[in-house]
Amino acid sequence: MSKGQLEHTNITVSDPERSAALFKRLCGWHERWRGPSQMGGWTVHVGDGQAYLALYTDGSGPLHHAKGAPLNHVGLVVDDLDGAERVVI
């Protein structure tokens, strides 16, 4: 079986700046990147040298999510892509 590690998690937030400030204070992380997102809107990445949170907003204003809905995706890095593919397919 392949070995993997969490690389990033992308979540939708109402205010990436405020969320980034919170996680930097709470976890001692730093800002890794910021800019326009691929889907429109804005993203700020905060984390350490190993993993990060991508804090995304589409700019549409206040967001109200059902439980679990703000999670967009989780990025994993694996040492054996073919082996990991066999596990999930």
Show which residues each predicted segment covers:
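Short beta-turn/strand-loop junction motif enriched in small, turn-promoting residues
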Residues: W29, S60-G61
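Short, conserved turn/kink motifs that form compact alpha/beta structural patches or helix kinks used as
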Residues: Y52, G59-S60
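N-terminal low-hydrophobic presequence detector
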Residues: T57-D58, I89
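Core segments of cupin and vicinal oxygen chelate
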Residues: K3, I11-L53, G83-A84
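Vicinal oxygen chelate
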Residues: Q5-D15, V44-H45, L63-I89
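Short, conserved beta-strand segments within well-ordered enzyme catalytic domains
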Residues: A54-Y56, G75
